[in-house]
């Protein structure tokens, strides 16, 4: 069986590389913008996504990240999105879950814990098939 596809959306190349390396039991694809994320989502149809909220052009805020979350769930409602962010944890974690994210994971990233969350998300995704 092939590894599950995972789309990592983050504007920080170092974080994308760290997650890709640390989550090698997934078929990782990456994006650093909304346009690239939507293209990768439509082309690869990953069941799993990690999403940083602080993306350009709103690096200091979260509007772009929440817009991407909405776009993902409109196009692929069964996709399990794990928001991975360091922005205003409590407020944004509640907002992310309310808006359809599977889970919120605060930075800095612990890859072992994130892997467990992604495995649980993939199990949940498979149960919807």
Locate the predicted segments by residue:
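C-terminal output helix
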Residues: 91, 109-118
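Two-component/phosphorelay signaling modules centered on CheY-like receiver
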Residues: 13-29
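Acidic, metal-coordinating helix/loop segments flanking the phosphotransfer/catalytic sites
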Residues: 30-48, 52-56
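Short amphipathic alpha-helix used as the core "switch/output" element in two-component signaling
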Residues: 39, 60-78
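The C-terminal output helix
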Residues: 119-129
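Alpha4 helix (beta4-alpha4-beta5 surface) of REC/receiver domains from two-component response regulators
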Residues: 63, 67, 87-103
